[in-house]
Each structure stands twice: as structure tokens, then as C-alpha cells.
Amino acid sequence: MTSFKLVKYIPRIKKKKSGLRKLARKVPTDRLLKFERIFKAQKRINMSVFKAQRVLDEIRWRYYEETVMILNLMPYRASYPILKLVYSASANATHYRNFDKANLFITKAEVSRSTIMKKFRPRARGRSFPIKKNMCHITIILNIVKK
């Protein structure tokens, strides 16, 4: 007879997203001016959606100055294109709408999938190996807040 060990099946517990914690620090909606918003999008960024999402989760519902400080100190490669996008959105807000940078607030920061760039790498014996590079679109909406 062969002996085998009985292993009890332990289901994996999924880690909950910290959405409530993020929403708890959001500015009250009565202080947000509804129609005073700046929309900025960057398309086809050479980065995975999941890597960009990790950085965007940290800057959502924060003031502009705090966001710039966080993005400068983050060690991720994804923070640099997002920092350029936030700079550009704030420059648009000050140039076109005469908004003050101290009153700017990030209300929406989202990332969506883009196309996949496909390349082929030559391998041994005349074979080829596909390389898939993921790309994403990043959208940021800045609102002005009454202080």
C-alpha cells in the first residue's frame, strides 16, 4: 500500500482594496467647484496597467503640491510619466483658466489598457520568440477647491 498525506484545503483570502481609506480623506463635495475642472490624458504610455495603477492609487484625492512631492519621492518607474502629466495639467490650469496651483485637487486618476506592441526575438535553430510590450492610457482630472 502506498501511504499519502491528507492535506487540509485552506482557501486563499483575497486582500481587500483600501478604497474606503482613500475616500475618507477626500475633500467634501460642497467645497469642490463642479464645473471648474481640467482634463488631461496621455495615451500609449509604455507601461503595464497594473504598474501605473499602483502609483495612481497613491495620488488620487490629494492636493497638487502634495501629489508632486509624493511622485518625486516614489521609487517606481511609473511615477515619472505620471509626474509629467500632472505638471502639464497644472500648467494648463494656470495658463488657460488662471487657477492657483495651491487650490488644485486631483479628483480622478485612472488608467486603461491600450494596444500591445508585439516584437519578435530570434532564437536558436531559426525559431522566433514573441515579445509583448503592454501600453496604457492615463487620465487625470484636476478640480479647483474653495478654501
Swiss-Prot record:
Protein name from the UniProt record: Large ribosomal subunit protein uL22c
Subunit-level organization: Part of the 50S ribosomal subunit.
Described function: This protein binds specifically to 23S rRNA. The globular domain of the protein is located near the polypeptide exit tunnel on the outside of the subunit, while an extended beta-hairpin is found that lines the wall of the exit tunnel in the center of the 70S ribosome.
SUPFAM superfamilies per record: Ribosomal protein L22 (SSF54843)
Keywords: Chloroplast, Plastid, Ribonucleoprotein, Ribosomal protein, RNA-binding, rRNA-binding
RNA-binding keyword on record: yes
Organism the protein comes from: Lolium perenne (Perennial ryegrass)
Classification via PANTHER family: CHLOROPLAST 50S RIBOSOMAL PROTEIN L22-RELATED (PTHR13501), LARGE RIBOSOMAL SUBUNIT PROTEIN UL22M (PTHR13501:SF10)
